[in-house]
């Protein structure tokens, strides 16, 4: 682990600058935009979207989550056609491969940590890519099929685990995007599991809403925003009478707060910012989880210097359970059933570096350090309560993103009347 960190440090030290942009989310995780270009009308294009990655999670909080490593690549070649200035179709395939893996769970990859090696496929995990993108106005897009998802939603860490950018399936369903100058709105339904009659699995889908209000004037130096986010996971179904578990389960996560960003007048591009979030958890239906309600508070400060983004934050919660967020923010263990944490606290540090290499190519690295502290740990299996514990966790990852696009043919517009 120390050699891996030293290797990344040396790369950062000797690399030469080619861009002043620096955000792992925008450059590496979610570089594509849903906005359609009028110049793309009648174009037939081939795109090769891929990411190679190596992420190591050294978790010492064994009572909460076990450590693991994700080495691999995902590849998503596709062909797109834009018959109109405001309509685009895309089809392809998404393939995920972990180095050294020969069997893959045959399921929707929404939480890789809980996936079991049963009903497997060989060589790689594969799902289709089919998307229709209709741009009703310059500010409104309706997407059917494969969504612009994952980090593109802009969800906070307690609601969404950034690791799903490398291990999660593409989201599928319906999505509405609304982006006037004063706000960004993203509403979607991600249909994760479809069932047939007498299916042994349950129907499962997730509804999400991510809004970011921007009251500041466009040219104002001090930019502040108000995030409002919601995730609701539903599991059920009426036609799967053979399922072992037919109980309805509905869970909700929400977050709201305020944040700001201020660019400094320096020769080197520098900006400072902070964000304060309150989060909420609710078990709307079912008794699968140990808590019915919970909450948490996250305060973060960040500094963007050249291509480097540094973040420091503090998290405090009570009976909060993330639906799609990292277990590090949870009051419930995923490594051992029956273990819960009493009032967990976490001090977190993040360091990110992202570099634009050229059109269709970018790379980045990320380091994370977390210091956990809770009032106590309750084990329902043997009815024991351990007072006060403190642990630390570390993660590091390196990512290379490729999104080259090739024009196959531009069809001529029919001028006949």
Predicted segment positions?
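Exposed, low-structure sequence patches enriched in small/polar residues
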Residues: 3-4, 24-26, 49-51, 72, ...
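Surface-exposed coil loops of outer-membrane beta-barrel proteins
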Residues: 141-212
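Sec-dependent N-terminal signal peptides
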Residues: 4-14
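Sec/Tat signal peptide C-region and signal peptidase I cleavage site
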Residues: 18-22
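Transmembrane beta-strand segments of Gram-negative outer membrane beta-barrel proteins
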Residues: 26, 34-58, 87-89
């Amino acid at each position: 682990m120390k050699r891996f960190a030293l290797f990344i440090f040396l790369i950062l030290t000797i690399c030469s600058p080619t861009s002043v942009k620096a955000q792992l989310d925008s450059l590496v995780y979610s570089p594509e935009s849903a906005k359609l270009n009028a110049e793309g009308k009648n174009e037939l294009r081939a795109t090769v979207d891929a990411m190679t990655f190596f992420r190591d999670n050294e978790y010492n909080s064994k009572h909460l989550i076990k450590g693991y490593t994700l080495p691999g690549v995902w590849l998503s070649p596709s062909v797109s056609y834009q018959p109109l200035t405001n309509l685009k179709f895309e089809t392809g395939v998404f393939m995920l491969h972990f180095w050294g893996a020969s069997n893959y769970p045959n399921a929707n990859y929404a939480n890789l940590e809980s996936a079991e090696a049963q009903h497997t496929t060989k060589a790689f995990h594969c799902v289709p890519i089919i998307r229709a993108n209709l741009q009703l106005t310059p500010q409104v897009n309706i997407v059917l099929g494969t969504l612009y998802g994952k980090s593109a939603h802009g969800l906070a860490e307690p609601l969404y685990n950034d690791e799903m950018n490398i291990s999660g399936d593409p989201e599928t369903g319906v999505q509405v995007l609304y982006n006037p100058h004063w706000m960004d709105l993203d509403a979607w339904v991600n249909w994760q599991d479809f069932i047939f009659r007498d299916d042994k699995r349950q129907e499962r889908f997730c509804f999400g809403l991510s809004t970011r209000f921007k009251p500041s004037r466009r040219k104002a130096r001090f930019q502040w925003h108000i995030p409002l986010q919601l995730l609701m996971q539903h599991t059920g179904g009426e036609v799967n009478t053979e399922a072992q578990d037919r109980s309805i389960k509905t869970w909700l996560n929400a977050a709201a707060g305020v944040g700001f960003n201020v660019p400094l007048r320096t020769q080197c591009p520098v900006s400072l910012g902070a964000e304060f979030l309150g989060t909420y958890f609710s078990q709307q239906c079912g008794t699968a989880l140990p808590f019915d309600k919970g909450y948490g508070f996250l305060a973060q400060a960040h500094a963007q210097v050249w291509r480097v983004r540094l973040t420091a934050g503090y998290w405090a919660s009570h009976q909060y359970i993330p639906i799609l967020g990292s277990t590090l923010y949870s009051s419930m263990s995923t490594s051992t059933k029956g273990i819960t944490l009493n009032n967990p606290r976490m001090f977190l540090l993040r360091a990110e570096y992202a570099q634009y290499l050229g059109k269709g190519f970018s790379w980045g690295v990320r380091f994370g350090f977390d210091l956990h502290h809770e009032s106590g740990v309750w084990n329902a299996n043997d009815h024991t309560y351990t007072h006060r514990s403190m642990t630390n966790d570390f993660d590091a990852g390196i990512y290379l993103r490729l999104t080259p696009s090739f024009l196959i043919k531009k069809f001529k517009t029919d001028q006949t009347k």
